[in-house]
Amino acid sequence: MLDELDLHLSTITNRYGRPFQRKTINAYKFAGVALHNWMTESSIEGDFTTCDVTTLNRFFRWYYTKHDVPKSQDGKGGYTGGTNTLQRNLRPLFLYLAEEYDHPSPYDSPKLHRYTAPPLGKPKTLSEEFVSDVLKATGNGSPKVRDFQTVRDHAIIRVLTEGLRAEELLNLRVEDLDLAQRTMLVIPLKMDRNTVDARVIPLQPKTAKALARYLRVRATHSMADATPFLWLGMRGRGALQYRGLYVLVKKRAKDAGYDPAQVAPHSFCHTWADDLKAAGVSGEHIMAIRGWKSPAMLRRYGADMASTRAVNAVQGLGDRY
C-alpha cells in the first residue's frame, strides 16, 4: 500500500497546487513504515485498512512513550513534537485509504488522541564575536589561504551570514551568482528553476570576494564540471550534502574555540535577521529578501534579541526632555 501511496502522491498536487517533493513523499512513507513495524511487533494482523481509532491511539501512545518522553527536559514527558509530526505525516495514507478502499479515516473521529506541536522557543542568535572568530578560523578571506577546503568553508560561512537556509545554500548553482552586481539568485525550495518567485539576495562585499576566490579553487576540483551545484564536497565527491554542511559548521565552531553544540547552520538565519533589524532595515525589506509571506516569521527570527534591540533603539534617542 505504501508503494500505491507513493504513486498516488507522485501524480497529484499539494494544497498549494504544486507537485509533492520527493522528500515529502518519503516522510509520509516513513510514517507508514513505522506504523507497519509497530503492527508487526504488536501481532496485529491485516493491512492498514484494519487500523481503527483505537489501534491508532495505541500506536501514537507507544510512539510518544518510546520517542518523545526521553526527549523531554525532565525525562518524564511533555514533549510531543515527534508524535505530532508522525500524526501529520500519516494523514495522507488514511486519506488515500478512504478514497481508494472506502476505509473510514480515523482522523475524522473526535476520539482520536491528538498530540499538539510543542511551542516554538527562541532560537539563540550568534554573537558578533562568534561569527568573527569562525571567519578567522577559515582564513578570514586572506589571499594567502588557497587550499580548497579552507577557501570553500570561508565562502560558505560568509553566505550563511546572508540569511540563507541550509537547503537554499546547498541548492545554489554556479549560474545563480552575479558577483559583478554582488547578488545571488535563490530558487524557492518547492519550485522549479523557471519560477518567477526566485529571490535576489544582496551580498556583502566580503561575501562576493569570498565567492570569487572559491570559484577559482572550485575550477581545480575533480568534480567541477560534473555537477552544476556551487558547493563541492571533499575527496573527489560531488555536490556537498546537508550532513557535510552540518559537520563543517560544527568543526569550524570548534576550531574557533566554541562549543559546537551551540551552533547549527540555521543559527545564522536568526543572526542575519537580528543584524538587519538592529541596523534599522524595514520589516518589509527583510520579508522580501527572506521570502516570508507572514509577519509572524519576522517576529520569530531574532526574537531572543528583541529586548536588546528595543533598549538600544530607545537609548539612541538620548534625552527627550
Region locations from a protein language model:
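N-terminal core-binding DNA-recognition domain of tyrosine recombinases/integrases
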Residues: 4-23, 29-121, 137-144
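Short, charged phosphate-coordinating catalytic segments
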Residues: 160-181, 284-288
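Catalytic-site neighborhood detector that most strongly recognizes the C-terminal catalytic loop/helix
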Residues: 188, 192, 290-316
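Short, polar N-cap/turn motifs at the start of nucleic acid-interacting alpha helices
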Residues: 176-179, 260-262, 281-301
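Conserved tyrosine-mediated DNA breakage-rejoining catalytic core shared by Y-recombinases
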Residues: 171-210, 296
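Short, basic (Lys/Arg/His-rich) helix/loop patches that form interaction surfaces
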Residues: 142-146, 247-288, 307, 316
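Basic, Lys/Arg- and aromatic-enriched nucleic-acid-binding interface segment
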Residues: 133-166
